[in-house]
């Protein structure tokens, strides 16, 4: 598992407006953590394209990602999950999409570089 990979994950149970259920997630944790930690940091992905209106929303192309339809990574919906929640590998985002994801994480966390 590497940063930029997409998996289906079981995100239930949830509270309030959290994204839940069996859904695609984007691995955003660094590869050292991915190798040694029992947990992984992910961002929820939705296929509701109308959601791509915030600076923390990044469009993901279905052609490159392996997703069944074009989708949106929700970088305000980042959470740490146990690796056992990851189910099926889907694919990867492109390098240019991952660069946009990294910028959206900076926006989400208020990091200025």
Q: What are the roles of these predicted feature ranges?
A:
Residues 1-113:
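Conserved functional hotspots at enzyme active or ligand-binding sites that engage polyanionic ligands
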């Amino acid at each position: 598992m590497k940063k930029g990979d997409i998996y289906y994950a079981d995100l239930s149970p949830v509270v309030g407006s959290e994204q839940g259920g069996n859904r695609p997630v984007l691995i955003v944790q660094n590869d050292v953590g991915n190798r040694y930690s029992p947990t992984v940091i992910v961002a929820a992905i939705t296929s509701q394209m109308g959601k791509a209106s915030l600076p923390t929303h990044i469009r993901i192309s279905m052609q490159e990602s392996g997703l069944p339809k074009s989708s949106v990574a929700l970088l305000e919906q980042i959470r740490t999950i146990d690796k056992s929640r990851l189910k099926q590998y889907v694919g990867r985002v492109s390098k240019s999409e991952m660069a946009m994801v990294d910028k959206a994480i900076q926006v989400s966390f208020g990091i200025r570089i």
